């Protein structure tokens, strides 16, 4: 059968609807967003809260967000660049750091709500699958839904590290264990030991030992900062364990200290800003150039 050219008639163009701008730009999955945002129709002022997780090249962003008619409102947020304050100075975008960010945003949100003592979460992490359950005589746990945006839901992805951290931190995040590292598809069981290894940076320590044996030059280039700080593979688990304790002790937000004051920044920027000339200065500049040109001609 010969190929027929598709003709777009006037009826096609008159009925064509352009997608939303953020859909055209490939930024928002509206099919997903509609289901994450739609509130219960029989309840008044009960927004759905989303645990929004996004990754950049050097940072992890975790926010608890609710949708309103005027726009999304961020209830609280946590970032991987805050982790050095808790002792995690390097590897701020790996799976273990993602777990720590999830734990931080959970503890920070519960502290803000005054539920941090009611819902302590999982204090002794063993890698088991656990959901936060409601206490008998008290408020229900704070419920959030994971919002991964356009990221792929690959088994073992870092986004589920943030989910696990938030769940262990005391938030109620509905989920199943089949996307965590250590999930066996055939047996349909979770290897808790493997998941615990990822939470405490065991996979990083394992890679350090492997590189040290096989390729010492590569080890020195990749783990240069670890060598300077005299951190060995045996110390990695302790670093993350201490960080989790520190996060639970004080999850409150503290702004980063600026190197200079606003006045100093302003004075520095003025050094490189070109000043606008007055009319008299421009005329004098032109007259000078004319005089120089005439002098060359003579």
From Swiss-Prot:
It comes from the Eukaryota. CDD domains: Ribosomal_L18_L5e. Keywords: Cytoplasm, Ribonucleoprotein, Ribosomal protein. GO terms for biological process: ribosomal large subunit assembly; translation. GO terms for cellular component: cytosolic large ribosomal subunit. GO terms for molecular function: 5S rRNA binding; structural constituent of ribosome. The keyword Ribosomal protein applies. The keyword ATP-binding does not apply. InterPro entries: Rbsml_uL18_euk (IPR005485), Ribosomal_uL18_C_euk (IPR025607). Pfam families: Ribosomal_L18_c (PF14204), Ribosomal_L5e (PF17144). It is found in: Cytoplasm. Component of the ribosome, a large ribonucleoprotein complex responsible for the synthesis of proteins in the cell. The small ribosomal subunit (SSU) binds messenger RNAs (mRNAs) and translates the encoded message by selecting cognate aminoacyl-transfer RNA (tRNA) molecules. The large subunit (LSU) contains the ribosomal catalytic site termed the peptidyl transferase center (PTC), which catalyzes the formation of peptide bonds, thereby polymerizing the amino acids delivered by tRNAs into a polypeptide chain. PANTHER family: LARGE RIBOSOMAL SUBUNIT PROTEIN UL18, RIBOSOMAL PROTEIN L5-RELATED. Component of the large ribosomal subunit. Mature ribosomes consist of a small (40S) and a large (60S) subunit. The 40S subunit contains about 32 different proteins and 1 molecule of RNA (18S). The 60S subunit contains 45 different proteins and 3 molecules of RNA (25S, 5.8S and 5S). Belongs to the universal ribosomal protein uL18 family. This is Large ribosomal subunit protein uL18. It comes from Candida albicans (strain SC5314 / ATCC MYA-2876) (Yeast). The lineage of its organism: Eukaryota, Fungi, Dikarya, Ascomycota, Saccharomycotina.
